[in-house]
């Protein structure tokens, strides 16, 4: 298995610190709002990578944190007239609802930064003691010049960074690139007692501390969105390695942005969507498959038209699954016949190809293509003449390959029939109202999904083709 390591900018053989075990830390949300589709891609990508590692036999300890104390949270809480804790509690609950709806598996642990104040204060104290940090007026800063390899993750040169950092710099800092690891209390802010007075941690130290306390000095995978590479992950490396003298993370994985209608997502452009808004209109399978239809290191473009295309493609997969489920009830032969054995063995090539694609830096786009190839093969070769054993095997194989992607696990019969009957009712209503355009549109949309309608004297019947 090979993974692309941002630290070295190349694909590397994936070799864990302890054979068969993976320690993985993913930067989670700041819990002051619902998470948007850009966040959703990050969560889906690393949920999929975690699932695939488990599919390949690894025991994964998966930590994803909640940032529940930070400038954005303080601002939002003050605007609402609530406390930061109340805000955090509310949006952690909302995160779980949306993540569950998106079929994201629960982490081994979701630590909250505020649960680790004693450990964070100890971390800051150790950095001061080792000469990597200094205190000024209750604020504590990390000295980037003391950490010789600062910039190694993002590939940035410290001298160039210093030139760019001289605008609006805090004159008290020894160097413009030094960053806060402890902030003194300002009026109206929550604070904790520390050797430097009342204050709160900087954002970067929170993740370093939680990773250290829950996973140890060195971890296998540290991951997050590509926007976190600098300064967040760069600063995490500096703090952690300064404290322990050991490599912080062996592999760094970063997922790319989601653009909306070929533009960067932003509230000012009115192209900002929360995952919840999309999940009200589309099933989780649709959003997951869309997010995984491009390589995780490549930016993807989001639009409702592209989601509709993904839905149509997914419907074709589910139609095939539905046909196989129906065949299970209809086929007469129970046991695998001799002439089917060779075909069953041939189907293994799809599993091998799928693993080959996913082992190559988790290439979900190509893995999904393999599933479509499998479905096309099965549609042609598994029929009413096949044995029940072969039909069941093909169904199980499709679901097995869908499982690491978090798709194709539902039984389709009831939900598909219900949806089609509802659309037929809408079409009948449109026809009564002489809205022929809508009636034809519903019929054509169903036909695209492999559903043909037959108008009979007894009513409308439908069948899959």
UniProtKB/Swiss-Prot annotation:
Gene Ontology cellular-component annotations: cytosol
Amino-acid positions noted as binding Zn(2+) in the UniProt annotation, renumbered to this chain: 27, 207, 232, 236
Cofactor(s) needed by this chain: Zn(2+)
The protein's Enzyme Commission number: 6.1.1.16
Gene3D superfamilies recorded: Cysteine-tRNA ligase, C-terminal anti-codon recognition domain, HUPs
One GO-annotated biological process of the protein: cysteinyl-tRNA aminoacylation
Sequence similarity: Belongs to the class-I aminoacyl-tRNA synthetase family.
Descriptive protein name: Cysteine--tRNA ligase
Organism for this UniProt entry: Clostridium botulinum (strain Kyoto / Type A2)
